[in-house]
């Protein structure tokens, strides 16, 4: 008998089929039609490169809305405490984030601005953001936007195997500043100032650059959650206040 363990992840659901040690990620077709997500076929070359570069397990696109992933079990659960208390492990993690930039930029194509625009495109709900799209573009370009980023770094997407780190879920892979990837990690894992400073020291990326992209992480989280949770969700309402303040103040 095939056993399925499922988990909903917004635009997609993830199923583990225990008979062949494979993980299947099934995408909601609405994410491509209504929210302008990139087609899975656009990721084939990215998946090939992440596997060859030892950044991730093998991914295989098997239909227009399903990918098959080789199951990867961590040696043990990675935690923020373990990551920041183990200097060697932190250096391995940051080296892997640098290695992401070895992916050919020509096959990534998507910019961080386009990622934002895919949510707000012709949507009257986001009128204020649309009105500031040129200022937003200028804000993003404060730092060079030519680094390949994972775009969704958090502990559930990071696996530790034989002192090697692998990343999962490349759906939000974009071209931006390297500070953006670390900002997203800091935002999603709620890092404190001391931990962000440590990231800065070991990565040689300024704290200023990392903090510069934190409002962008708030913005993306807000746009995503309004889709999957609705605007009446408590977290969405709190984020909306922060986003409104940020958008109002960019010039």
Regions found by a protein language model. Give the residues of each.
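Active-site acidic catalytic loop and adjacent metal/ATP-binding pocket
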Residues: 13-17, 136-180
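Active-site activation/catalytic loop segments of kinase-like enzymes and analogous catalytic loops
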Residues: 179-206, 215-233, 242-246
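ATP-binding glycine-rich phosphate-binding loop
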Residues: 1-19
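A glycine-centered beta->alpha junction motif in the catalytic cores
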Residues: 29, 65-84, 102-105, 121-122, ...
């Amino acid at each position: 008998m095939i056993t399925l363990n499922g988990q909903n992840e917004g635009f997609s659901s993830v199923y583990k089929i225990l008979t062949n040690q494979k993980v299947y990620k099934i995408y909601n077709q609405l994410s491509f039609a209504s929210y302008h997500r990139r087609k899975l076929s656009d990721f084939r070359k990215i998946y090939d490169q992440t596997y060859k570069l030892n950044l991730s397990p093998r991914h295989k696109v098997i239909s227009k809305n399903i990918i098959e992933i080789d199951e990867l079990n961590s040696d043990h659960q990675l935690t923020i405490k373990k990551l920041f208390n183990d200097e060697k492990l932190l250096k391995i993690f940051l080296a892997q984030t640098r290695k992401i930039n070895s992916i050919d930029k020509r096959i990534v194509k998507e910019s961080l601005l386009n990622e934002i625009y895919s949510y707000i495109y012709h949507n009257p709900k986001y009128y204020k953001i649309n009105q500031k799209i040129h200022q937003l573009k200028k804000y993003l370009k404060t730092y060079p936007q030519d680094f390949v980023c994972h775009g969704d770094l958090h502990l559930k997407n990071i696996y530790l195997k034989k002192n090697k780190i692998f990343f999962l879920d490349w759906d939000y892979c974009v071209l931006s500043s390297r500070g953006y990837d670390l900002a997203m990690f800091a935002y999603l894992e709620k890092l404190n100032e001391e931990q962000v400073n440590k990231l800065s020291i070991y990565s040689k990326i300024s704290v200023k650059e990392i903090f510069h992209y934190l409002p962008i992480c708030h913005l993306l989280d807000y746009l995503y959650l309004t889709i999957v949770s609705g605007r009446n969700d408590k977290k969405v309402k709190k984020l909306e206040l922060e986003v409104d303040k940020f958008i109002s103040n960019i010039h």
